Amino acid sequence: MTSVLFVCLGNICRSVAAEAVFTQCVAARNLQADFRADSAGLIDYHEGELADNRMRRAAAERGLTLTHRSRPVTSADFSRFDLIVAMDEANVRGLESRRPQGNATPIVRLADYLTAHASPTIPDPYYGTEADFHHVLDLLFDACPNLLDELLEK
């Protein structure tokens, strides 16, 4: 089973939605026995909280239910997951600074899997408008199937 961890800053907007979109892609291909997804944040400020209400509403409009509760990245995550997927460069740097010595778990940027959108990152919608949350979902629905395709090729 391939395990994937999606990471953003607080684990209440982007990473929790990416986890849900990726899980939906896996289920649509009947691959639940082959993949496991989770999400976490670089900070613990929102630990135990559900996703931001605005993201939950936007996700619900696309058929997603976000039930994950925020949790921080732990050092154990680097050995528990086969791949860690960051939403932006700051997330990559934060993950690299937490990486246990000797760990080689790949860290990739989800935006690198975009094909229908040109964006260097999955931008944080937290201080934005409702439209920003929908834009993030557009990006996630673009990138996650491509990420899954690449994992299936390995």
Positions of predicted regions on the chain:
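Phosphate-binding/catalytic loops
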Residues: 83, 89-154
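Conserved active-site segments centered on acidic
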Residues: 1-80, 149-154
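Helix N-cap/beta->alpha junction signal
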Residues: 15, 88-89
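Hydrophobic beta-strand core positions in alpha/beta domains
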Residues: 6, 85-86
